[in-house]
């Protein structure tokens, strides 16, 4: 029997009525100056739906490939859930990989979009994440859009017509979103090996 269901329904529709106010995600920062973030099932659902609508507004649809090249922040989980909600195939790439390794993965899966951040904090250093994406995309032809999470507030290049800020994309988006009906054999994500080429 080939069942049809969106995996996010097992997280949200199944749990919202009974566990809506219960904690779904606890994010602990590395930097003691930052505060932990607690998201309830209801908050996670609303943020996932808001970003799902943003993805659809950018033309992302069932079967499209989306690269997630982000630090370990709550928005990374939201990005994965939003991709699943709209039926897009996500591929998480460690945000410490080089531009060449990122480009290899983008080209291999023929991704249409990259989700990233302006930068990341690692110890006392600020890592220029978006710069790595820009360098990688010089070798990629499939990417149509890039959504950038403002994490470090450092100055970065934003290419007109391609790059958008996360907070601007979700502005005025509804907090509900119909899930894409998926077949049990449909692809959910692509996870490459940790080698330099991922093959």
Listing of model-derived features with the role each one plays in the protein:
Residues 8, 21, 25-81, 98-103, ...:
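Conserved AMP-binding/adenylate-forming core of the ANL superfamily
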């Amino acid at each position: 029997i080939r069942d049809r269901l969106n995996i996010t329904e097992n997280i949200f529709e199944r749990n919202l009525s009974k566990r809506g106010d219960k904690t779904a995600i606890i994010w602990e920062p590395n930097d003691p100056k930052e505060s932990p973030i607690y998201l309830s099932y209801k908050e996670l659902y609303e943020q996932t739906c808001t970003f799902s609508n943003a993805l659809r507004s950018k033309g992302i649809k069932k079967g499209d490939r989306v690269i997630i090249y982000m630090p370990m922040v709550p928005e990374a989980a939201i990005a994965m859930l939003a991709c699943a909600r709209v039926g897009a195939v996500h591929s998480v790439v460690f945000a410490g990989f080089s531009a060449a390794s990122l480009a290899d993965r983008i080209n291999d899966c023929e991704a249409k979009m990259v989700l990233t951040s302006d930068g990341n904090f690692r110890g006392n250093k600020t890592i220029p994440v978006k710069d790595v994406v820009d360098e990688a995309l010089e070798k990629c032809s499939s990417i149509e859009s890039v959504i950038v999470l403002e994490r470090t507030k450092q100055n970065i290049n934003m290419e007109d017509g391609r790059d958008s800020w996360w907070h601007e994309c979700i502005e005025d988006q509804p907090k509900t979103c119909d899930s894409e009906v998926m077949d049990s054999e449909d692809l959910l994500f692509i996870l490459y090996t940790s080698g330099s080429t991922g093959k």
